[in-house]
Regions:
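Alpha/beta catalytic cores of group-transfer enzymes, especially the acyltransferase/condensing modules
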Residues: 10-12, 38, 100-252
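Cys-dependent protein tyrosine phosphatase-like superfamily
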Residues: 1-4, 221-231, 236, 245-249, ...
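Non-catalytic positions within long, well-ordered alpha-helices that form the structural scaffold/packing
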Residues: 76, 184, 265-268
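Short, solvent-exposed amphipathic alpha-helical segments in soluble enzyme
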Residues: 22-23, 147-149, 184-186, 287-290, ...
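FabD-like malonyl-/acyl-CoA
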Residues: 1-141, 194, 271-301, 305
Length: 311
C-alpha cells in the first residue's frame, strides 16, 4: 500500500491537543525546542490555552507547526514508516517541509511566527474576511466572486479549493459579504463567515509575500528527503530556492487541495494519513477521491491504530 502524510493548518487547533502524547520523550523534546525558538512556554500554551490565545494567528501558526511535527516524530519513534509523499494545507506545508528535512524545526518555528505577523499586518484587523461556500462548483464560485468584486469595488477571491462543493473565499469584508449574498442566490447551500483575522491566501496578502521573501532568503533550505506536493502549483520541487519561491507565492495564492489529493492518487497513493490535531483533511480525502482513504492520527489511540495497519 502506498500512503501519504498530510499536515493540517489553522483551524484545527484546540487546547490540550497534545495531551495524549505529551509524555513521549520525542514530543517533550519537540515542545522544548519550540519554546526555546520562540522564547516562551509553548507546551503551557498548548496544554492550558486559553483558546483565545491559541486562536491568535501569531500563536496558531507556531503551535500547529509544533503539533504536526510532534505527531510525525511520535509516529517515527513508534516504528512507523516514512511516507512516500507528503503535503500540508496552508501552514501545514511548513510542517511537511520540516518532516521532509527541508527546513530545520528550529528555523521553522520563528519562520511561521514571522509569516503570521506578516499576514496579519498586510490587512488591518476587521477589514478583511473569509467565508466557506458549500454546494457550488469551483467555476461558479470564481465567476460570482468576480461579480461581487465589481459590484462592491473590493477584492474577493476563491482561495481554498478544499473538496467538491467546498470552497473558501477571502477578501475585503464588504466584498466577502456581497459575494455570500450572490453565492446564496446562485444556489449555494451555505455561505458561512469564518472566524479569522485576515483574508488568508487572497491577493490582498501580497505585502506578506514580499516580507516572507526577505525572511526566507536568510534561512537554509535543503533538498527534500521525501517528496512534498506544494499548495500553489501542485508540484513536487527539489531545488531549495524553488521551494522558497513557492512558499513566498503561497501566502497570497489559493490552496489547491483537491488537486493535491488527486495528484497523490495518480502516484498510486491509496491511503492518506492526517498527521496532527483534528480530522478535517482526513474527512475531505474521500470526498475528493473515493479510491483514497483518509485516516487521522490526532492522539495516542489513533496513532497506534493507524500504525498497526501501515507497519
Amino acid at each position: 500500500m502506498t500512503f501519504a502524510f498530510v499536515f493540517p493548518g489553522q483551524g484545527s487547533q484546540s487546547v490540550g491537543m497534545l495531551n495524549s502524547i505529551s509524555e513521549r520523550p520525542e514530543v517533550r523534546a519537540t515542545l522544548q525546542e519550540a519554546s526555546e525558538a520562540l522564547g516562551e512556554d509553548v507546551a503551557k500554551l498548548i496544554a492550558e490555552g486559553p483558546a483565545e490565545a491559541l486562536s491568535l494567528t501569531t500563536n496558531t501558526q507556531p503551535v500547529m507547526l509544533t503539533a504536526g511535527v510532534a505527531f510525525y516524530r511520535a509516529w517515527l519513534a513508534a516504528g512507523g514508516a516514512a511516507p512516500q509523499v507528503m503535503a500540508g494545507h496552508s501552514l501545514g506545508e511548513y510542517s511537511a517541509l520540516v518532516a521532509a528535512g527541508v527546513i530545520s524545526f528550529k528555523d521553522a518555528v520563528p519562520l511561521v511566527r514571522f509569516r503570521a505577523q506578516a499576514m496579519q499586518s498586510a490587512v488591518p484587523v476587521g477589514t478583511g474576511g473569509m467565508a466557506a461556500i458549500l454546494g457550488l462548483d469551483d467555476a461558479t464560485v470564481i465567476k460570482v466572486c468576480a461579480e461581487a468584486s465589481a459590484a462592491s469595488g473590493g477584492v474577493v477571491e476563491a482561495v481554498n479549493f478544499n473538496a467538491p462543493g467546498q470552497v473558501v473565499i477571502a477578501g475585503a469584508s464588504d466584498a466577502v459579504t456581497k459575494a455570500c449574498e450572490l453565492l446564496k442566490a446562485a444556489g449555494a447551500k451555505r455561505a458561512l463567515p469564518l472566524p479569522v483575522s485576515a483574508p488568508f491566501h487572497s491577493s490582498l496578502l501580497q505585502p506578506a509575500s514580499e516580507k516572507l521573501k526577505g525572511y526566507l532568503a536568510e534561512i537554509e533550505f535543503k533538498v527534500p528527503t521525501i517528496s512534498v506536493i506544494n499548495n500553489v502549483d501542485v508540484q513536487i520541487l527539489n531545488d531549495p530556492s524553488a521551494i522558497k519561491d513557492a512558499l513566498v507565492r503561497q501566502a497570497a495564492k489559493p490552496v489547491r487541495w483537491q488537486e493535491t489529493i488527486q495528484a497523490m492518487a495518480v502516484q498510486g497513493v491509496t491511503q492518506v494519513v492526517e498527521c496532527g490535531p483534528g480530522k478535517v483533511l482526513a474527512g475531505l480525502t474521500k470526498r475528493i477521491n473515493d479510491q483514497v482513504t483518509g485516516v487521522p492520527v490526532f492522539d495516542e489511540a489513533s496513532l497506534n491504530e493507524v500504525l498497526a495497519t501501515l507497519k
